[in-house]
Amino acid sequence: MKLGMNIRNWGPTATPGFLTECAQYADRSGLDAIWFNDHVAMPPSLENNPYGIPQDMGDIVDPLAFGNFLAGITSRIEFGTGVLVIPYRPALLTNKLIASIQVLSGNRFLLGIGPGYLDEEFKALGVPRTRRGKITDEILTLLNESSKNEIVNSNGQDVALKPRLPLPPIYIGGNATVAIPRAIKLGHGWMPVSSSPDELKPDIARMHEQGAAAGRSDLKTVHMKTLPLAERNEAIDLACAYQAVGVDHLVHTQGYDSPAHYAEVVDQVDGEIRAGLK
């Protein structure tokens, strides 16, 4: 099982120097990937906040801009969005930005995507929330087609998208029933929201069963979870439990207040947790 960690592209940690120190330390470690998230325009107050978003996230660096930043300051580690809210962005521009990250990073980008949920952000961006699933499928279809064809059609216009997209692994985020079928049809795996190993086990099995029926034996599961690192044995047992139910890439998420603190957590995940995996 691969191991990753979050890197916060928001708040007081989202400065060039802070992000560079953290990303380059992770790059020098044996950590497999670092992950970051997406918000475009946060309202001053939230009516619906199921994921406990901080009321004031401070500065939020765009994840695709951050991906290009990481491409230039790292050389080995993979990095990805957990998740990119894909209906927020125009299809062709999204394709261009992802292709640019892939080219500049040597194909190290991992694309976790989600259809979004925040009513206020959809309203601010002028995107109908009711069409988020359809828009998501349209953009994923374009990404897949542009990685295979020199010419693609967008809004009735044939265009050549260059650089041609080296398709990154696409992980479909969320626990909605449509996520797994979408992953099988248009992605490379599933990225569920924080769930226990027992909760994930039947869904991962269902994904592989349905995937096999569709000729897809390559599907992976990426899962983000805050491991109880202060309790070493408990954290190792939990990581092993995720591995046992079929999680392919476990991402530890937590806050940190300095590059040195970030480095300590990276060392715990890449050292103690990795050593404890079966």
Regions found by a protein language model. Give the residues of each.
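Active-site-adjacent structural elements that line small-molecule/cofactor binding pockets in enzymes
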Residues: 1-278
